[in-house]
Amino acid sequence: MTDASLSRIRSLSAAAPSVPLLVDVSRTCLPTHAKTSDPLLLEAFPAAFSGMAALEGGAIANPDEKRRVGHYWLRAPELAPEHLGQAIEETVARVKAFAADVHSGKVAPESGKRFTNVLLVGIGGSSLGPQLVADALGSGEDKLRLFFFDNTDPDGMAREMDRIAAAGGIRHTLTVVVSKSGGTKETRNGMLVAQAAYTALVSAGLGEAFN
């Protein structure tokens, strides 16, 4: 790194250790000597803040699907419209309770043992987000091992099934299917592959039939 680059980072970054948060805008078009009184910022900041307020208030951000952008409401449900905030808090509580039941063995496979694996089936952000969390925060102390069907490549899914087999098999694996729309064809393909693996257990007399 050159002295000029380091100087620019120092001039155009700010740290808030108590959060913790570091904001670095040194790679933007802002001049090194930029100040909050500059016309560029005087125009940009109000527009950015009003746009953020509109999104947080539930404005339609995807007109094609008539969808709002509220994923950050999961982290701060108090920002969501009242009825949505309550629904988010109740849903998060149910998810946490279900996870606790899986960890404790209250929700368990037919073998009577606990689930040791989770297979997540999803495409795009539906799998990329969980993969990021698993890679960033996972450790050897995790109670469940994570596996992913994140595309429709048959060889890729076969390799992941081999990894699951080496980790105790599909009979000890809880499968989670994630789709924003509920109708993603690629996700359905992965779900059918997982379903076929469970059906094979039934054929082998190692499980009960399911729909």
Regions found by a protein language model. Give the residues of each.
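Glycine-rich phosphate-binding loops that contact phosphosugars or nucleotide phosphates
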Residues: 97-100, 104, 113-211
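Extended, charge-enriched "interface" segments that sit outside catalytic cores
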Residues: 1-111
